[in-house]
Amino acid sequence: MAWCLVFMVFLIYCLISTVGLPVAPADEAAMQLGGVGGGRLSVEPSDVMEASLDFGRLTSAEPLAVFHPRGAGDVAALVKAAYGSASGIRVSARGHGHSISGQAQAAGGVVVDMSHGWRAEAAERTLPVYSPALGGHYIDVWGGELWIDVLNWTLAHGGLAPRSWTDYLYLSVGGTLSNAGISGQAFHHGPQISNVYELDVVTGKGEVVTCSESNNPDLFFGALGGLGQLGIITRARIALEPAPHRVRWIRALYSNFTEFTADQERLISLQHGGRRFDYVEGFVVAAEGLINNWRSSFFSPQNPVKLSSLKHHSGVLYCLEVTKNYDDSTAVTVDQDVEALLGELNFIPGTVFTTDLPYVDFLDRVHKAELKLRGKGMWEVPHPWLNLFVPASRIADFDRGVFRGVLGSRTAGGPILIYPMNRHKWDPRSSVVTPEEDVFYLVAFLRSAVPGSTDPAQSLEALERQNREILEFCDEAGIGAKQYLPNHKAQREWEAHFGARWARFARLKAEFDPRAMLATGQGIFDSPPLLAES
């Protein structure tokens, strides 16, 4: 093992030296990159082990080394060295390690740890800027910055906040922008990738390219939702808005799926400027369960809402989840607005549950649940998550085939989200693949396997088997679903995933990462694509 380590360090030394970057030993298992801001290359077993795992805990792949950059120049120098090497060493960016199936891993390559970059220090962060041309504020952030830190910073400097969110805020900016970034605000603001003005991207050639809708648009839109295939996002210019002070958070139960989805779709169709909710989600609940789930602490632990009390509604239930934002100027009308909006919905009478909390507490709700699960040793367990975009025209078939078919009452293991989005809020020039209907649903099976559980339904094997059954049903029934945070095993499956957009994606890959070195953990390209394929 020792000789492998020596060879590995020597190999990386040679790679870096070929582009003129001086290297000096730091300790027995790390080296310092000089002249580019202090990036550090580590082969410490603890660093390598951490980079070989992710949140999913489903796969493991050890890199040769982990690189800790101080800025985009460091990232570019490393990628340029790898690009110029004889074999084209694999390079993957890692934010907070929240991938599910090894997407940010780099077996036998180098993982770039983006979590401690040059904007991660408060003294080096930029302040929000008002742009008359854009008609609003924005902020430039490091690609490895966590969204929770962006939120806290912008709130403290102008009472501002990003417009679009994910449910969990301890994710990196570059990570979510490489996928899409969605939550209950997406029906109105679009995903996070629709709320970005500009990027700096380190391409697979080691070049730092600034791009936007009008400047290098192919790279800009290709990188947004591009699964890290075209480059590493080192800077993002994020749209901001004035942050509300408080949130009225409401849940209501349905037993009729058609009424549930009709109400959801009506709510996301309401126009801005009129009376509407600011966030629309929902989830599936087994009749013997609780309306609470690990994603939030909606109710007091001393007073949970037991669904078994709904004696006349057996089987699968559906929970609508909405919020209304307000501040001092609108506090006097929030009750009236909520009452009017709820008055047009068809939930089960007597099943409306409401709470009120600060805006930040609502956005950070999942983290509070994370802390509880960590305390019980239930956070770092396998997470065989499955996220699907389902066209609205087939969501009723999906309900019959999956919620009432494959799953039945076996919904243990974690929440199952379901909520619609408006396709016109997604820019078709991005790399994200969605169903080609005006409205489509996210259906997210966010289950956790419980090691040592006496319930076989909560085992990893059982949950992965259910995932396969769900995907098989979608294929056999022609549902037309597309995976979000996709996980495919072969290039032909990726070609089917992208469909008519594959040729463009392969062309962009050949242009910006011609040696196919970046984000190989995604498993998209078996070999470097040829420009002729476009």
From Swiss-Prot:
Pfam families for the chain: Cytokin-bind (PF09265), FAD_binding_4 (PF01565)
Glycosylation sites: 152, 256
Enzyme Commission number, as recorded: 1.5.99.12
InterPro entries named among the record's database cross-references: Cytok_DH_C_sf, Cytokinin_DH_FAD/cytokin-bd, FAD-bd_PCMH, FAD-bd_PCMH-like_sf, FAD-bd_PCMH_sub1, FAD-bd_PCMH_sub2, FAD-linked_Oxase-like_C, FAD-linked_Oxidoreductases_BP
Tissues where the protein occurs: Expressed in inflorescence meristems.
SUPFAM superfamilies: FAD-binding/transporter-associated domain-like, FAD-linked oxidases, C-terminal domain
Chain coiled-coil ranges: none
Catalytic activity: N(6)-dimethylallyladenine + A + H2O = 3-methyl-2-butenal + adenine + AH2
Family designation: Belongs to the oxygen-dependent FAD-linked oxidoreductase family.
Complexes and interactors: Monomer.
Protein name: Cytokinin dehydrogenase 5
Organism this protein belongs to: Oryza sativa subsp. japonica (Rice)
